[in-house]
Swiss-Prot record:
The keyword Coiled coil is assigned to this record: yes
HAMAP family given in the database record: ARC_ATPase
Species name: Paenarthrobacter aurescens (strain TC1)
Family of the protein in this entry: Belongs to the AAA ATPase family.
MF annotations from Gene Ontology: ATP binding; ATP hydrolysis activity
Protein name, UniProt field: Proteasome-associated ATPase
SUPFAM superfamilies assigned to the protein according to its UniProt record, in alphabetical order: P-loop containing nucleoside triphosphate hydrolases
Gene that this polypeptide is encoded by: arc
Length: 602
């Protein structure tokens, strides 16, 4: 029974009903029969009065209950606000936490004879805090096994470790020079300053190599993490692209020569050992630009991977292709270029240690390894060349690593690099002749391209016959010796003259550009004239436009150097005259001045 109404001095509904019934009974009992109608009327009136009082009491009770609920809600809200304010006051009065770095973890020990007390036996950690080294206790809520050296911890006002945090994410960048055991290392910082540092717990589980960049907290002397540097990432080994010898056109003899030199040692190592032969350490690919030197280098790496996987019976064996562009290695600081070269071969040896073949490809080799003593403004080659020589045939062996160099000025490379035993195989990548050009065209003009209906109808709807005819007519136009294809007239030092045609400066890159240009013409015809498909006329027009773009390219100031880069070797050239049929064909040629020596630079 709810007694809340008794607190207000009011009867409950049950009590009111009982009182009304008792009153009616007494009054009815007091009436002596015979009953009269007037007495009954009085009794009914009194009952109604009592009922009205009961309803009034019920309304008062409902109002009191509602007021009581509101009061309870207000009290609960006030209690929550009081608790919030109390917590805020406690937090404002709480002293700040401090940070420390773990130097050493001291688990609980059994007291030994002569020990100095609990400081040497209880669980504790040695930390750096505000430049001081201290031994502090650990809260029972903190698991000591989850802490590691170099890690940051949170300390309360009593300098008790109450929480373990992560590692500092900022610091000084240093270079690893030497490992000193498992937990220490010798590093080189700014101004070549060397110092011994400790390795953090997270860093002790990482495989570190000489030359790695580390983040150092100089306040505590801890190396915290390994940092990938941009200059190092540029030298990261790349997996070989999916390029095979079948993707290269017009270089059959050169590819066969390279396969004999590179693949035979992998296919028949027993025969090589029996005959006392060693695999070549390097290959030099030289020739004019755009003739496929880089493609061949990638195909060599792909082929080596396939042969190595076949020999090892492991189809998952990968090969790696490290593409190094000569100018990327040059650095204005003394010794940095040599360090980059050491890093390249260190990474190559690391990857090759598991049997994976690694190809180190130096593009534009003449820009980096020039003949010593030929520098005009510097002598950096006097230290760069010996560094490469020591890496190729030094004390450390290069197993499963082959060096491939590419250059269009092989006459500028230091002779010590070109001697047998270093770059053993030298392959000249010549400009394609008509047959080789047709082979290259066939790589780009394939039967899955859309061809014009008239061209297909001319050859009976045979797609392959249409492709063959397109290739044949385009090659004939490119290699024609008609007057319209005359390009240059060169005069040699002995007075002889020679007429050079566009075919003398053709390359695989030019062939690809001609096909791409023809495809763009086909797309433009489709958009403007609604005529879909590649036509022979597109290819012939592309040949003419491609040649005209090169009419101003010959360097008439230093024609001999320009001719050497373009692949024209032999007698020194003293005079060049452009013979292009067009706007530049009427311009007179220019002779060079021979009074000053400009060196090897153009």
């Amino acid at each position: 029974m709810d007694t809340s109404n008794n607190d207000l001095g009011r009867p409950t509904p049950e009590e009111a009903n009982d009182a009304a019934e008792n009153t009616a009974s007494r009054r009815l009992g007091a009436v002596q029969p015979p009953e009269t109608s007037s007495e009954l009327t009085v009794a009914e009136r009194q009952i109604n009065i009592l009922r009205d009082k009961l309803r009034h009491i019920d309304r008062q009770l409902a109002a009191a209950t509602q007021n009581n609920s509101k009061l309870v809600s207000m009290l609960e809200t006030a209690k929550a606000e009081i608790l919030r304010l109390k917590g805020a006051l406690e937090q404002e009065g709480q002293p700040p936490y401090s940070f420390g770095t773990v130097v050493q973890i001291n688990p609980r020990k059994q007291p030994a004879a002569g020990s100095s007390g609990q400081a040497a036996t209880e669980e504790s950690v040695d930390i750096f805090n505000a430049g001081r080294k201290m031994r502090v206790g650990v809260s029972p809520l903190v698991n000591l096994n989850q802490l590691a050296v170099g890690q940051e911890v949170l300390l309360n006002e009593a300098l008790l470790v109450v929480a373990g945090l992560g590692y500092e994410r900022a610091g000084e960048l240093v270079t690893l020079k030497e490992m000193l055991g498992r937990d220490r290392a010798l590093v080189v910082g700014r101004a070549d300053e060397e110092r011994v540092v400790r390795l953090s717990g997270a860093l002790q589980s990482v495989h570190l190599k000489v030359g790695d960049a580390l983040s150092l907290d100089s306040r505590t002397g801890y190396a915290l993490e390994k940092v990938p540097r941009a200059e190092v990432e540029n030298l990261v080994l790349e997996e070989v692209p999916d390029i095979t010898y079948q993707d290269i056109g017009g270089l059959g003899p050169q590819i066969e020569q390279i396969r004999d030199a590179v693949e035979l040692p992998f296919l028949h190592p027993d025969l090589y050992r029996e005959h006392g032969l060693k695999a070549p350490k390097g290959i030099l690919l030289y020739g004019p630009p755009g003739c496929g030197k880089t493609l061949i280098a990638k195909a060599v790496a792909n082929s080596l991977a396939a042969r190595a996987a076949e020999r090892a019976g492991n189809t998952d064996l990968k090969s790696y292709f490290l593409n190094i562009k000569g100018p990327e290695l040059l650095d204005k600081y003394v010794g940095e270029t040599e360090r980059h070269i050491r890093l390249i071969f260190s990474r190559a040896r690391e990857k090759a240690s598991d049997g994976s073949p690694v190809v180190v490809f130096f593009d534009e080799m003449d820009s980096l390894f020039r003949t010593r003593g030929t520098g005009v403004s510097s002598d950096v080659e006097t230290t760069i060349v010996p560094q490469l020589l020591s890496e190729i045939d030094g004390v450390e062996r290069l197993d499963n690593v082959i060096v491939i160099g590419a250059s269009n000025r092989e006459d500028m490379i230091d002779p010590a690099i070109l001697r047998p035993g270093r770059l053993d195989v030298k392959v000249k990548i010549q400009r394609p002749d008509a047959e080789a050009a047709a082979d290259i065209f066939a790589k780009y003009i394939t039967t899955d391209l859309p061809f014009h209906a008239q061209d297909l109808a001319e050859y009976g709807g045979d797609v392959q016959a249409t492709v063959d005819a397109m290739v044949q007519r385009t090659v004939e136009a490119m290699y024609s010796t008609e007057k319209s294809n005359e390009y240059l007239e060169v005069t040699y030092a002995n007075g002889d003259t020679e007429m050079l045609y566009f075919k003398d400066f053709n390359s695989g890159a030019v062939v690809q550009n001609v096909v791409d240009r023809a495809k763009k013409y086909a797309i433009k015809d489709l958009l403007t004239n609604q005529q879909k498909g590649l036509r022979i006329d597109h290819l012939l027009r592309a040949v003419v436009d491609e040649f005209r773009e090169h009419e101003d390219m010959p360097n008439t100031t230093n024609p001999d150097d320009w001719a050497r880069i373009s692949g024209k070797k032999g007698e020194r050239i003293t005079y060049i005259r452009t013979i292009v049929q067009g706007k530049a064909g009427q311009e007179p040629g220019k002779s060079i001045e021979t009074t000053a020596n400009t060196g090897q630079y153009l």
